C-alpha cells in the first residue's frame, strides 16, 4: 500500500496537525493507563525534531457531540505530555478559527468530539481542520476504521496528508502477517461470541493453515462437533455456520481444531472450582471456562511450528487464575516461538500484560476495532484516504 510517510517529509517551520489515539482511561483527573500516549510520543517527538509547529488532536470517551463536558476533557492527557515531553504543552479549546503557534511548540486541541459534525465526517468541519495546517498526519490506527472529520475528512482537504510512524508500523506489521505471511500461518481468535467475529473467522478460514478458536466461540464449535456443552455460553443458531467454517478450512488445506479436553466450573466467579474433563464428559450443569492441558499442548505444538501467528482474544476466562492456564500456555507458546507474531484487541493485551510477554511479541497492535476490520479484509477509510492523497 502506497502512502506518504511523515518520516520522509521536510517539516521545518511547518504547521503539522497530528491525529493520535489518546483515548485513555482517566480516573479523578489522572491517566490510569498510558499505553496509547506512550505509543504516540515518538511521532510527536519526531515532528519536534524536524522543526515543526505541532498540533495534536484526539477524541476521549463518548461525550455528547457538540457539547463541552469536563469529564471528557483531554486536560489529564496534556498534564501527562507536559512531563513526558519535558516542555509546556498547551490545551486549546477554541481552535477551529485558527491557532497562534511558536516554533517547536506543542498544542493539544480539546476533544474532537466536542465539535458538531465530527462523527458524520462533516465537510465544513473537515475544511476548518485542514485550514489549520500545512501537513496533516494520520497516526491513529485505533480509529482508522472510522470515516470521521478528524481521521478522514481533514485529510481530503489538507495540503499534504500522510501516515505517521505509528500508523505506518501498524500497516507494515499487518501486511507482513496477512498479505505475504511466512507459513504455516496460525490465527487464534477468542472471545465470547461467534456472531461478533463471524466475518473475521470467515475471512481467516480462507487464508490460514490453522485457525484456533477460544472462549465462547470455541464452545459453539464444540457443540457443532456433537459434544455436550452444558450451561456454557454458546450460540446454537450458529452451529451450522461453525460446521461450514470447518469445512471451508479443510477445503483450503487448513484446519479448525476442536478441543479434546476442557476445564469446567459450575458458576462464573473467581471462587468457582475448576474441574478438568474430557470434552465428551461435560454434564448439563457444567460451564466450559478454559481448554484443558492436552488441548493446550497440541495448540502449543502448532504454534511452535508456525511461521506467522495472529492472536486476537484469550482462549479461556483468564481473569480467574484457575481458568487461565490455557491462555497462559498459548501466550508462552507464542513467546517461545520463532514465528512473526502480531497481537491485538483489549483482552489480548490484558493477557499479554498478565503473563509478562510483551517483549516477546513481534508486534502489538494499538487498534481494537481497526485490527478486527483489517483481519476481515476490509479497507480502512483513513488508509484509503491516505492512499488516494499519495497518487
Swiss-Prot record:
One GO CC term on file: cytosol
Pathway(s) per entry: Carbohydrate degradation; glycolysis; pyruvate from D-glyceraldehyde 3-phosphate: step 2/5
Main location: cytoplasm
SUPFAM superfamilies associated with the record: Phosphoglycerate kinase
GO biological process, one term: glycolytic process
Broad enzyme group: transferase
Gene3D superfamilies (alphabetical): Phosphoglycerate kinase, N-terminal domain
Subunit composition and interactions: Monomer.
Listed EC numbers: 2.7.2.3
Record family assignment: Belongs to the phosphoglycerate kinase family.
Residues annotated as binding ATP: 197, 319, 345-348
Highest taxon, organism lineage: Bacteria
Species assigned in the record: Pseudoalteromonas translucida (strain TAC 125)
Keyword Secreted (UniProt): no
Binding site for substrate: 21-23, 36, 59-62, 113, 146
Keywords: ATP-binding, Cytoplasm, Glycolysis, Kinase, Nucleotide-binding, Transferase
Protein name, as recorded: Phosphoglycerate kinase
Reactions catalysed, as given in the entry: (2R)-3-phosphoglycerate + ATP = (2R)-3-phospho-glyceroyl phosphate + ADP
Compartments it resides in: Cytoplasm
GO molecular function, one term: ATP binding
Alphabetized InterPro entries for the sequence: Phosphoglycerate_kinase, Phosphoglycerate_kinase_CS, Phosphoglycerate_kinase_N, Phosphoglycerate_kinase_sf
Amino acid at each position: 500500500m502506497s502512502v506518504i510517510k511523515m518520516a520522509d517529509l521536510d517539516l521545518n517551520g511547518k504547521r503539522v496537525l497530528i491525529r493520535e489515539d489518546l483515548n485513555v482511561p482517566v480516573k479523578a483527573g489522572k491517566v490510569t493507563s498510558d499505553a496509547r500516549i506512550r505509543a504516540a510520543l515518538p511521532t510527536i517527538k519526531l515532528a519536534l525534531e524536524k522543526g515543526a509547529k505541532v498540533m495534536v488532536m484526539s477524541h476521549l470517551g463518548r461525550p455528547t457531540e457538540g457539547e463541552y463536558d469536563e469529564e471528557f476533557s483531554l486536560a489529564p492527557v496534556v498534564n501527562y505530555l507536559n512531563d513526558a515531553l519535558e516542555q509546556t504543552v498547551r490545551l486549546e479549546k477554541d481552535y477551529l478559527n485558527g491557532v497562534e503557534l511558536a516554533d517547536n511548540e506543542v498544542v493539544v486541541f480539546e476533544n474532537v468530539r466536542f465539535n458538531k459534525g465530527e462523527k458524520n465526517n462533516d465537510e465544513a468541519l473537515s475544511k476548518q481542520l485542514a485550514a489549520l495546517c500545512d501537513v496533516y498526519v494520520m497516526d491513529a490506527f485505533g480509529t482508522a476504521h472510522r470515516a470521521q472529520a478528524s481521521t478522514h475528512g481533514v485529510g481530503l482537504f489538507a495540503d499534504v496528508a500522510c501516515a505517521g510512524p505509528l500508523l505506518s508500523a501498524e500497516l507494515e506489521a499487518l501486511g507482513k502477517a496477512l498479505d505475504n505471511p511466512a507459513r504455516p500461518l496460525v490465527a487464534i481468535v477468542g472471545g465470547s461470541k461467534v456472531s461478533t467475529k463471524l466475518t473475521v473467522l470467515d475471512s481467516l478460514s480462507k487464508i490460514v493453515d490453522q485457525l484456533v478458536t477460544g472462549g465462547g466461540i470455541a464452545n459453539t464449535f464444540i457443540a457443532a462437533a456433537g459434544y455436550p456443552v452444558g450451561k456454557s455460553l454458546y450460540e446454537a443458531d450458529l452451529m451450522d455456520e461453525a460446521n461450514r467454517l470447518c469445512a471451508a478450512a479443510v477445503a483450503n488445506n487448513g484446519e479448525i481444531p476442536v478441543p479434546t479436553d476442557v476445564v469446567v466450573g459450575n458458576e462464573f466467579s473467581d471462587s468457582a472450582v475448576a474441574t478438568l474433563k474430557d470434552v465428551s464428559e461435560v454434564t448439563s450443569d457444567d460451564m466450559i471456562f478454559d481448554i484443558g492441558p492436552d488441548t493446550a499442548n497440541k495448540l502449543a505444538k502448532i504454534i511452535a511450528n508456525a511461521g506467522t501467528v495472529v492472536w486476537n482474544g484469550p482462549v479461556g476466562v483468564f481473569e480467574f487464575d484457575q481458568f487461565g492456564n490455557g491462555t497462559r500456555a498459548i501466550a508462552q507458546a507464542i513467546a517461545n516461538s520463532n514465528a512473526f507474531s502480531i497481537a491485538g484487541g483489549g483482552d489480548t493485551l490484558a493477557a499479554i500484560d498478565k503473563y509478562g510477554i510483551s517483549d516477546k511479541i513481534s508486534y502489538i497492535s494499538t487498534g481494537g476495532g481497526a485490527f478486527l476490520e483489517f483481519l476481515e479484509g476490509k479497507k480502512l477509510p483513513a488508509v484509503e484516504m491516505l492512499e488516494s492523497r499519495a497518487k
